[in-house]
Amino acid sequence: LEDWQSGQDHVGLYLYNGNEYLEATVACYKSRTVPFNINFRYVDEELIYLLNNAHVKVLIYHSSLSERVMNIRSEVPSLSLLIEVDDESKGTLLDGALAYEEILCTAKNGFPAIDHKPDDLYMIYTGGTTGMPKGAIWRQVDMLVAALGGKTSKGTVIESLQEFQERAMRGYHRYLASPPFMHGAGSWVALKALHSGSTVIIQNDVRRLDGDDIVDTCIREKVDALMIVGDAFGRPIADALVRKPRPIPSLRNIITGGAVTTANLKTQLLELLPEINIIDAAGSSETGTQAQHVSNALVGAKTGKFTLQRGNAVLSDDLTSVLEPGHDGLGWWAQSGHIPIGYLDDKEKTAETFVTVDGTRYSVPGDRVCLLEDNTLELHGRDSMTINSGGEKIFAEEVEQALKHHPDVYDVVVTSRSSDRWGQEVIAVIQL
């Protein structure tokens, strides 16, 4: 197989957060099928594109999403099995679909004879950084190390199942992964928690972000680590604490990734919850976790700077050389080592994103950075065509093309502006 090809069957997870999402994920890996994330906010056209691009064989979906599944199933010829998870919405099982709980209750005991391999695939669909969503495909052994807890607290790679078991026996953390599991920020922290023997907590309202619900869940379930996605998640939580001040005595760490958390918001959160650390975790679907930075009441709040870590590099504009500290201008933030093998069925984009420089293979998803004299990385955001809005990556050219389909639009330019809530928001100048 080439780097952009898969030899396994693919299972779509069209689900809100819940135990079924994580159960189905693990079950797919056990059966040597490849689960992949589906944005539950997609409209029919987007869903059809994604499912066909992924060559989906099985779709697991919540019953409240069944009408959309019914609308698009005939447009996805590879789809051969539907599994419906009951979320107490009204309606009957789709024709030919199987009920999730019934499958569990009637399953045979024991495990089938399956030969698992380190290069079995993990796949995560991008939110649009690459234009239309694409499936970044990894070897499971690489993803485990890159983002799912395959390293010790000292940063060394865990080499044996026994080491995982011994660590899990000591696991005690209680994680609330507030982002949707269909977002890497949500599913990665949940799987990392499970791999370390810790507990995954899920808030009551999983269809929208409710700051009070997040705070109350942290208090009730004694959460000590909360995952958020930048200001889009952090600000409603801060607002909830301002409206109704209350301590969260168990909370020690707020982990934020996928979008910028501004220094102003960090300062506010540290004033409201002075005992916590705010951990910036930078990375992408194409790199895993690349770097971390900690803010707390002792060191203050900063945003946008990270220490260069093992496997990180800054590449020149033409992607032919590694830049040294103190270089002129901006470079591309790159990651080597445990990185994806490519994008599903996209030879051209695989070649563009995964480059070899001086014999080392790098993933270069598009972040612009400057490596300062002291080896500090200063982030300058994605390239100008990509907009990060609340953790969702929006390709400006794709939005322009969609708007130009409207018969009254003569020309359009799409860009972004700063937003207190979303980090960036999409704006357009339209000529009619």
Kindly give the residue locations of the regions a language model identified.
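Conserved AMP-binding/adenylate-forming
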Residues: L1-Y42, R252-L377, R382-T386, K393, V399-E400
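AMP-binding/adenylate-forming catalytic core of the ANL superfamily
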Residues: Y42, I48, L59-Y61, I219, ...
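Structural core segment of the AMP-binding/adenylate-forming
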Residues: K30-C105, D115
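Conserved AMP-binding/adenylation subdomain of ANL enzymes
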Residues: L144-A177, M182-A225
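ATP-dependent adenylate-forming carboxylate-activation enzymes
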Residues: L15-Y16, T33-L51, S63-R68, S198-C218, ...
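Adenylate-forming
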Residues: Y16, Y61-M70, E88-S89, P179, ...
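Conserved pre-ATP/AMP-binding loop-to-beta segment of ANL
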Residues: C105-Y125, G131-M132, I137, Q165-Y175
